Amino acid sequence: MANRNLSESLFKPRQKHQETSTLVKHRDPRLIAGNYSTLDGNSHGSWYRMINRLMWIWREIDPFEIEEVLCRIAMTNAQRSDDNLLDTVIGYRKGNWVFEWSHQAMLWQQRALQAEQIPEASNFWLKAANLYSIAGYPHLKGDELSQQAVILANKAYENAARCSGYQLRKIEFKLKEGGCVTGFLHLPQQLQRPSPTILVCGSLDNLQSDYYRLFRDYLAPLGFAMLTVDMPSIGYSSRLRMTQDTCILHQQIIHQLDEIPWIDHTRIGLFGFRFGANIAVRLAYLESKRIKGVATLGAIVHEWLSSVERQQNSPSMYLDMFASRLGIYNVDEKAFRLELGCYSLKKQGLLGRRCSVPMLAGYWQNDIFSPKEESKLIAMSSMDSQLLAIPTTPVYNSFNKALREISQWLRNKVC
């Protein structure tokens, strides 16, 4: 009942909220590029958001449920901020992206409250958490409805963990500039001693709660604990902004791991997804004595950040997401591209230098955000490296196999 009341109080009718696609302003007209990326999904001319079926299904959202929600959004006649984009319905009502995904989450939340078996309740809460997270996607700063969905996602996630066989600890990490940031420490079952730990550096469009399956199915069976933290400007890190020192948040966390009794701070590995790989690789150079291994998947460390052509061919949502993380809301295209180039680890003078930390770089052929050259650059920079090519078909099985190979590689390097 308390959770239902929280949902009602957060989403009660108010004045019109600013629609997500209008939060970042561009001086030049934008084109909705039609592209496909294995790790990020499809970008269609009729949708503002990228439709990321692979990752949503991997997070155990039923494919039919995904299509049902998308259909409800597409079929509405409600007012849109852009009549050409289906997911731009204004206000919290039927057809609005946050409304429809949150409505779906509430159905699972209700089932969780009525569940008679604890494992069943945990599974239902986790589904609710994932659906609330999708409701907030792509988590742009200033999106009030998205922020409300994130609150519910975190609440549902904590309820899921409370009902599961694993332990979830909320850890407060102190920041040099004052205040704290909250991370989730996931601990394996029957913990008897401090665990080797993987710090996940997530992609810019995901909450830290989106990686539970990575822990449950891949890391925990190998004896790992998993530590997550939200990327700057979203979730528990919403008041922070991404800077050219991309790893500053995660670096401060690494310096505090020796204070956490459940973590073996002498056995720490990193797993970086997309732009999270930028953070992980940067940390490998700056904290080489504290890190035993770094794995990356679809890394964004140089090519996309430096290529005007790649950026021009990228979906509008993706550019808006980067601008939002950097705290840019009125975009001058030329200045924005110059700013993105400053985040290249090669231009920063790091990538290309030999690094003592073992690194694995996984990639998909013809990835619009992370070409093979990106992963080769990472592999060539480490004295102990592996390049992992991931087949594009069958997409789900290949992704699952890659995660198992990467997890085993981390075990060999970290444990």
UniProtKB/Swiss-Prot annotation:
Pfam families referenced in this protein's UniProt entry, alphabetically: FrsA-like
Keyword Disulfide bond in record: no
Keywords for the protein's UniProt record, in alphabetical order: Hydrolase, Serine esterase
Entry EC number(s): 3.1.1.1
Catalytic activity of the protein: a carboxylic ester + H2O = an alcohol + a carboxylate + H(+)
Superkingdom in the source lineage: Bacteria
InterPro entries: AB_hydrolase_fold (IPR029058), FrsA (IPR043423), FrsA-like (IPR010520), FrsA_esterase (IPR050261)
GO molecular function annotation: carboxylesterase activity
Residue numbers spanned by region Disordered: 1-23
Top EC group: hydrolase
Entry-linked HAMAP family: FrsA
Similarity remark: Belongs to the FrsA family.
PANTHER family listed in its UniProt record: DIENELACTONE HYDROLASE DOMAIN-CONTAINING PROTEIN-RELATED, ESTERASE FRSA
Protein role: Catalyzes the hydrolysis of esters.
Protein name: Esterase FrsA
Gene label: frsA
